[in-house]
């Protein structure tokens, strides 16, 4: 029996009590929870129910009767359609407060820990919260008689929203994407059709090194064949000297994953170089690197503040990517060991260590939950561990290993408060949370990064 008093299509007034983990407004109508994208805490609004479930209603914003002082006009022309950003309509200072609250909500929802007893610090923001993303991944589609469009899929859909400019992207990523889009149209290169499974070019990926100016272009294709390749490469080389690496990645899977397993060089170098905390890093096409290089240094500074190091410690950098975090700490510890499931990332990490003259690091391809127990069996026990997992959080096998290993210091760098809270509830068996530091890596979105210092409990 449906306990929800709301019917689909119904319009009703609502007061927004708080904002949710996806940046939506939350209110209550006859005690039933209502989620309203685009609404802000404290606003009095009129909404229309678009999806009704037993326990909640999703509604669209029809009218604002009382506007929040934190409401601003979103500067992006496709903001509401695109879905890439969720908070452009919220003043930046209020975005930072919301992100701290999102961390609190996650603790409340996924653990039995009382967040009022935790030290959750104010969110560290950016001075200029725009044009920060160093990487773009724009989908392609063919419209009309041969016109090529590039953009992002709308929120919860596979409807492409054409994007001419994106104001959270580094300008060069947009410049390169638009140039390549026009080349694809000029030469009539077949564009991938998701429904039919036909066509060739699926996605245009561009990544830039903000400190070096080096830029990499990757054609994601449905086959090894890339028509008019020679002509396009010649035009790119002539018009875009900043593009120092051009790669092709083949992805024939019918999935939402951008990259396939096979990547090869078309022109220039295999990787681009970026600098971070006075270190140099080579980035290959599939390797993970933080998307906001400006805030990454702030993030790593917070990790550095969290750890107490004397120089005699052994440190594990789990989910190490190209080795950025571990190599930033290599000069402060006896040994760093890192692992990652992407072979190219480990190759990059080894090359980066050599480039930076760092000799006390060891890297291995594999899952953290498999590699760490293997190292322990071989006699290696870390004094400190840094985990920086993907949005899915730490594998449960790794959590078990961490509890078995009992490193005195554990720093968890999270990009998803929900999975962070889930993992903290498990780690609480042996660790206590010293503090949580939210960092805004993705202004204008509901995403929040959190640095958590955990300390082994006394036995």
UniProtKB/Swiss-Prot annotation:
Keywords: 4Fe-4S, Iron, Iron-sulfur, Metal-binding, Methyltransferase, S-adenosyl-L-methionine, Transferase. PANTHER family: PTHR11061:SF45, RNA M5U METHYLTRANSFERASE. InterPro entries: MeTrfase_TrmA_AS (IPR030390), MeTrfase_TrmA_CS (IPR030391), NA-bd_OB-fold (IPR012340), SAM-dependent_MTases_sf (IPR029063), TRAM_dom (IPR002792), U5_MeTrfase_fam (IPR010280). GO terms for molecular function: 4 iron, 4 sulfur cluster binding; metal ion binding; rRNA (uridine-C5-)-methyltransferase activity. Residues 5-63 form the TRAM domain. This is Uncharacterized RNA methyltransferase lmo1703. The active site is at residue 415. [4Fe-4S] cluster binds at residues 76, 82, 85, 166. It comes from the Bacteria. Coiled coil: none annotated. Belongs to the class I-like SAM-binding methyltransferase superfamily. RNA M5U methyltransferase family. It holds the Pfam family tRNA_U5-meth_tr. SUPFAM superfamilies: Nucleic acid-binding proteins, S-adenosyl-L-methionine-dependent methyltransferases. GO terms for biological process: rRNA base methylation. It is an enzyme of class 2 (transferase). The lineage of its organism: Bacteria, Bacillati, Bacillota, Bacilli, Bacillales. Its EC number is 2.1.1.-. S-adenosyl-L-methionine binds at residues 290, 319, 340, 388.
